[in-house]
Design a protein with these regions (language model features):
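Hydrophobic packing within well-folded, soluble alpha/beta domains
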Residues: 47, 57, 63, 101-104, ...
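Short glycine-/acidic-enriched loop or helix-start segments at secondary-structure transitions
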Residues: 59, 74-75, 150
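Glycine-rich beta-strand-centered segment in the early N-terminal region that forms part
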Residues: 4-69
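NAD(P)H dinucleotide-binding glycine-rich loop of Rossmann-like/cofactor-binding domains
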Residues: 26-34, 66-142
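Mid-domain Rossmann-like dinucleotide-binding core that forms the NAD(H)/NADP(H) cofactor-binding site
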Residues: 108-186
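Cytochrome P450 core scaffold surrounding the K-helix E-X-X-R motif
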Residues: 1-3, 74
Length: 187
């Protein structure tokens, strides 16, 4: 798949199936997406090529990709995301800045690891900003999704009592993740 997009950096092996619905969907900066665009924010794989200034020794490393594309000056102006402002994890190969690529050694699968930066990063930010501490009660709406599942687990690790809003079919899974109680979402 080396066609209209350029350098192959990491083999994309997983994504959370996040897609844009129309050509008018806006990016994080409020601009319309440029199409064609390959979606996918969640990426884990192996480095197959590197750009200028990056050690060739990195080729073959198993890596996790931070999907947040920050400007070189460190500002939060014009922040972009892999799979939105740049081709993403649905591609066979993904080109990202070396600063967004992190070596990882784990028994977890690529699919499991790929969920960490976006879903778990979002959940961690939410719980940190809310200052969730031991003994508090956390109600998680949307507990069946990726971010919701991460909130259930991370809130439980903080010692919070978690109530997960989910479907009856997925209630057992949410309890296994650490929810103390579940509420059927159509109730």
């Amino acid at each position: 798949r080396i066609g209209w997009y350029s350098k192959s950096v990491a083999t994309a092996t997983a994504d959370a199936l996040q897609t844009a619905s129309t050509a008018t969907d806006g990016g994080w900066a409020g601009n319309a997406f440029v199409f064609p665009r390959i979606q996918g924010t969640d990426v884990c794989g192996r480095i197959v090529a590197v750009g200028a200034g990056v050690s060739q020794a990195r080729i073959g490393e198993r890596v996790l990709v931070d999907p947040v594309l920050r400007p070189a000056d460190g500002s939060f102006e014009n922040v972009g995301y892999v799979g939105l402002e740049r081709d993403g994890g649905f591609a066979e190969f993904v080109a990202v800045p070396a600063s967004n690529v992190f070596w990882i050694e784990s028994a977890l699968t690529d699919v499991e690891l790929a969920s960490f930066p976006c879903a778990y990063g979002t959940a961690e930010n939410l719980l940190t900003r809310a200052n969730v501490v031991q003994g508090e009660v956390v109600l998680v709406t949307g507990a069946s999704g990726g971010v919701g599942s991460a909130v259930v687990q991370l809130a439980r690790l903080r010692g919070a009592r978690v109530i997960a809003v989910t479907t009856d079919e997925r209630a057992h899974e949410r309890l296994a993740l650490g929810a103390r109680h579940t509420v059927e979402r159509s109730a």
